[in-house]
């Protein structure tokens, strides 16, 4: 572990160098701890950002490499907190967090590549094994597709022991297992990195560009790896951030670098985020999250002062249409396509093919709106108003309104021919229930060929069958059940209802009050209501059993009637009678109109007379409402301020607790580090002693099992083993010595007789050897002497020539030798004289230096003696002066005592005065005191 920093080692360059040295020796965790301790220190607030940024960058690299996400998060929070007030502090924070995300993404890509390579190798090995065993086993197929990294497992849910055991013993695909082992940890790390970085960058106007970029990267991460659970959490996190921004704006409690939602660029940036969120939610098929995203987009659009771009709104309406399609809300699905087509048709980039396709979808979605009962329930009203506001509509859309919009804007000219024929067939007035079946089947066969149009056939079938049943009920009083069901079955279609499904549709139509009939299954007859008073009686019966919250139902049957039913005649009889009587009065009484005008004038005068009072009442009421509104707004504002204050206090408390936790964490880490270092030192000492013991070969100690042993115990073990070995060795030596002694005695006793015989043999051999060596030496000496005499005779012949040649050479070299000797003598004398001069000069210099030193020493001694004499003289003067002062003080005291005695005589003797030390010493010198 890295030792704690000292004050002299606090400089950033020293810390960075130490971390690099630790990395170089392979201690990356120690280097990470060293950098982390510097980053979380408060002293770095006074350092330059350019000095701290390399340290933070290296810390992030190590944290990503070692997968220390929590440490990186704490370090980034502290780094931002410490340098955010610096000149370029926030720019450095953006650089570091971007690097953090980029490194995490690179690690994830590397893990994915590694997993792909491993999966390919396993598949190749499995294919080879299958090929070798196919002759015997015939091969057994299986699914090769693993879940991969895009599984539905939750990255924030820790693995339980049961899940680990289950994954180990299960027969899951090896690709899935490889992905889970290699890719999932880095997926989890990258997700935690996104969360940490977004928390660091949130709600700061200078960081919002980087914040938006990281949000887009997080969206891409969720889309690329199909992370649905993480996408939901990401959306909730963004909503929380947005809520805090709006709360700060409304309560006016924004702090330094707060987000300004009145800025057009800021709002546009947030809109881009929400539109991206909506698109990803639709692609991931998270429809509830898509609807929440739509709500977020609509809230931002409403709050924005600047209208969003048309292409963004077109995308917004298109996604809304997809969401409504999933929720089976056909009415708002068609309304969304209507709004989308209005914008798309005005785009200069729109092509004829796209216009044709979108117009066909709009017409099909409009025709697919079923004819159901619209209930005026409060909850439905609020829901419809909410959906209408999302579509920027002022009222709830209707099927008739959408059809009128299609006709008024001539959208049918863009529509495909089969869909245009279907529209004319259903809305053009040529709807014949008994003959339309064949035409519908032909058109549906064409529509089914298109995958996007095909999904509207079920709802179109329901709409068409309901209209058929309604018009049959207007013509017939009773029909066979089989006949009615046969009208609802379209053969030769991919989507065709069965008899049971058609009957179920009829029952639901009766339940929704779209048609009135009864079914007699025993006789197989369907009877339509023919008594004009049946429905009226039923309405009165329902009115008698309902509560005050009566549900008024209206049949919205937008179809042409073949004839008026008896029930309709009864319902409209009174209204027709009233209209007829009114027309008769005009004809019978000519003054009726004049009386009506007079009554109107009188009523108008009364209204004018009461207008002033009514205006005053209205003014008073508006004032009361205004006061109430002001009071309510004040209460709301006070409550919001109180809530904001509580949130600020809570945030401050959390920050304080977090700071205390960080301090405690630092202390704990320091203590742990010290404890680990102590343990490491002890462990090293134990290991060193154990290695020494093992090297000596005294005992054998397992170096991997030293936890329960300490140095004292190891030394005791060594001493005990040495004592034991010593005792064993002494015992063995005694036994060996005793055995050797007995054996040696036996050997000597046995060989005594043999040695005497061997001695005689040895003497004979040695004598023979001596004679042989002696004769050999004599022969060799004679031979050498003869050779030497022969050599002398040969050399004697050349001796005169040698002497003559030597004399000549000596004569030639004698002159040269004398010259060289003379030159050498001259050089010697010269060097000798120079040496003498050098020695003289050196000795003279030494003499001068010695005399100078003696002179200085004599002067210093004289000065010292003079100073000592002066000090002695001064001391003597001080002593004399002190004695004079003492004598004077003594005389003064005697005079004062005498004066006091004279002034106050007393019978008692005067007290004896205590002498000072100086007086006693003076009297002793004078001999007056012993």
Swiss-Prot record:
Keyword Hydrolase: no
Gene Ontology MF terms in the entry: mRNA binding; translation initiation factor activity
SMART domains: PINT
Sections of the chain in a coiled coil: 72-125, 620-902
Gene3D superfamilies: 1.25.40.860, UVR domain
GO biological processes: formation of cytoplasmic translation initiation complex; translation reinitiation
Domain PCI: 355-533
UniProt GO cellular component terms: cytoplasmic stress granule; eukaryotic 43S preinitiation complex; eukaryotic 48S preinitiation complex; eukaryotic translation initiation factor 3 complex, eIF3e; eukaryotic translation initiation factor 3 complex, eIF3m; multi-eIF complex
Subcellular location: Cytoplasm
Pfam families listed in its UniProt record: eIF3a_PCI_TPR-like, PCI
Residue numbers spanned by region Disordered: 130-154
Gly residues bias spans: 136-150
InterPro entries in alphabetical order: EIF3A, eIF3a_PCI_TPR-like, PCI_dom
Superkingdom of origin: Eukaryota
Key words of the record: Coiled coil, Cytoplasm, Initiation factor, Protein biosynthesis, RNA-binding
Functional description taken from the UniProt entry: RNA-binding component of the eukaryotic translation initiation factor 3 (eIF-3) complex, which is involved in protein synthesis of a specialized repertoire of mRNAs and, together with other initiation factors, stimulates binding of mRNA and methionyl-tRNAi to the 40S ribosome. The eIF-3 complex specifically targets and initiates translation of a subset of mRNAs involved in cell proliferation.
PANTHER family for the chain: EUKARYOTIC TRANSLATION INITIATION FACTOR 3 SUBUNIT A (PTHR14005:SF0), EUKARYOTIC TRANSLATION INITIATION FACTOR 3, THETA SUBUNIT (PTHR14005)
Subunit structure: Component of the eukaryotic translation initiation factor 3 (eIF-3) complex.
Family: Belongs to the eIF-3 subunit A family.
Protein name in UniProt: Eukaryotic translation initiation factor 3 subunit A
Taxonomic path: Eukaryota, Fungi, Dikarya, Ascomycota, Saccharomycotina
């Amino acid at each position: 572990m890295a030792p704690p920093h000292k004050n002299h080692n606090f400089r950033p360059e020293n810390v960075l160098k130490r971390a690099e040295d630790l990395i170089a020796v392979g201690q990356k965790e120690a280097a990470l701890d060293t950098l982390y301790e510097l980053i979380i220190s408060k002293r770095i607030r006074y350092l330059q950002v350019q000095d701290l940024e390399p340290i933070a960058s290296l810390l992030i690299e190590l944290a990503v490499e070692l997968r220390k996400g929590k440490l990186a998060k704490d370090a980034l929070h502290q780094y931002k907190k410490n340098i955010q007030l610096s000149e370029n502090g926030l720019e450095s924070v953006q650089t570091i967090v971007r690097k953090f995300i980029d490194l995490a993404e690179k690690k994830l890509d590397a893990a994915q590549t590694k997993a792909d390579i491993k999966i390919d190798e396993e598949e190749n090995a499995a294919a080879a094994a299958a090929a070798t065993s196919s002759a015997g086993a015939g091969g057994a197929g299986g699914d090769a597709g693993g879940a991969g990294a895009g599984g539905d497992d939750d990255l924030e849910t820790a693995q339980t022991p049961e899940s680990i055991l289950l994954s180990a013993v299960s027969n899951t695909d090896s690709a899935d297992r490889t992905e889970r082992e290699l890719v999932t940890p880095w997926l989890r790390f990258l997700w935690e990195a996104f969360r940490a970085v977004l928390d660091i960058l949130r709600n700061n106007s200078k960081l919002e560009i980087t914040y938006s970029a990281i949000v887009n990267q997080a969206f891409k991460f969720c889309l690329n790896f199909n992370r649905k659970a993480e996408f939901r959490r990401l959306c909730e996190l963004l909503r929380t951030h947005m809520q805090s921004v709006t709360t700060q704006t409304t309560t006016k409690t924004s702090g330094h670098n707060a987000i300004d939602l009145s800025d057009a660029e800021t709002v546009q940036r947030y809109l881009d985020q929400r539109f991206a969120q909506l698109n990803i939610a639709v692609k991931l098929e998270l429809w509830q999250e898509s609807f929440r995203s739509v709500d977020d987009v609509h809230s931002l659009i409403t709050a924005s002062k600047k209208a969003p771009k048309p292409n963004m709104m077109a995308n917004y309406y298109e996604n809304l249409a997809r969401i409504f399609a999933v929720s089976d809300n056909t009415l708002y699905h068609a309304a969304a396509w209507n709004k989308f087509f209005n914008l798309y048709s005005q785009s200069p980039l729109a092509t004829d093919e796209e216009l044709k396709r979108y117009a066909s979808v709009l017409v099909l979605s409009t025709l697919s709106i079923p004819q159901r009962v619209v209930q005026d329930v409060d909850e439905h009203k609020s829901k419809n108003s909410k959906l209408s506001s999302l579509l920027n509509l002022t009222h709830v859309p209707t099927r008739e309104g959408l059809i009128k919009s299609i006709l008024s804007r001539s959208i049918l000219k863009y529509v495909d021919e089969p869909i245009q024929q279907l529209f004319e067939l259903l809305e053009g007035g040529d709807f014949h229930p008994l003959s339309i079946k064949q035409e519908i089947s032909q058109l549906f066969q064409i529509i089914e060929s298109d995958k996007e149009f095909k999904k509207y056939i079920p709802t179109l079938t329901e709409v068409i069958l309901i209209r058929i049943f309604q018009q049959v009920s207007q013509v017939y009083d009773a029909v066979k059940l089989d006949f009615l069901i046969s009208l609802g079955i379209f053969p030769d279609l991919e989507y065709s209802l069965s008899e049971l499904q058609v009957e179920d549709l009829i029952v639901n139509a009766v339940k929704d009050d779209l048609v009135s009939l009864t079914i007699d299954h025993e006789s197989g007859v369907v009877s339509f209501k023919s008594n004009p008073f049946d429905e009226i009686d039923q309405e009165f019966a329902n009115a008698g059993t309902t509560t005050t919250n009566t549900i008024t139902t209206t049949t919205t049957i937008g179809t042409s009637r073949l004839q008026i039913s008896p029930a309709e005649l009864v319902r409209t009889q009174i209204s027709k009678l009233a209209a007829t009587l009114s027309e008769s009065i005009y004809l019978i009484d000519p003054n009726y109109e004049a009386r009506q005008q007079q009554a109107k004038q009188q009523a108008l005068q009364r209204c004018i007379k009461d207008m002033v009072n009514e205006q005053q009442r209205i003014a008073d009421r508006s004032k009361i409402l205004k006061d109430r509104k002001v009071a309510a707004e004040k209460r709301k504002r006070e409550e919001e301020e109180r809530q904001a204050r509580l949130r600020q206090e809570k945030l401050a408390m959390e920050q304080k607790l977090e700071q205390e936790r960080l301090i405690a964490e630092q202390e704990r880490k320091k203590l742990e580090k010290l404890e680990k270092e102590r343990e490491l030192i002890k462990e090293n000492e134990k290991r060193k002693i154990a290695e020494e013991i093992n090297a000596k070969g005294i005992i054998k100690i397992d170096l991997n099992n030293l936890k329960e042993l300490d140095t004292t115990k190891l030394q005791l073990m060594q001493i005990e083993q040495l004592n034991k070995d010593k005792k064993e060795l002494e015992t063995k030596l005694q036994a060996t010595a005793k055995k050797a002694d007995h054996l040696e005695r036996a050997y000597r006793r046995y060989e005594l007789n043999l040695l005497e015989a061997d001695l005689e043999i040895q003497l004979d051999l040695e004598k023979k050897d001596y004679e042989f060596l002696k004769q050999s030496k004599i022969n060799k000496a004679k031979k050498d002497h003869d050779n030497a005499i022969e050599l002398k005779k040969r050399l004697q012949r050349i001796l005169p020539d040698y002497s003559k040649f030597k004399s000549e050479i000596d004569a030639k070299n004698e002159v040269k030798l004398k010259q060289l000797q003379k030159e050498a003598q001259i050089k010697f004398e010269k060097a000798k004289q120079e040496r003498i001069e050098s020695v003289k000069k050196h000795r003279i210099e030494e003499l001068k230096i010695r005399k100078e030193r003696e002179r200085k020493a004599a002067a210093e001694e004289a000065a010292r003696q003079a100073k000592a004499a002066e000090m002695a003289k001064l001391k003597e003067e001080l002593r004399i002066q002190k004695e004079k002062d003492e004598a004077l003080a003594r005389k003064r005291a005697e005079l004062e005592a005498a004066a006091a005695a004279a002034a106050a005589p007393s019978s008692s003797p005067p007290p004896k005065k205590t002498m000072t030390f100086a007086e006693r010493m003076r009297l002793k010198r004078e001999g007056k005191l012993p």
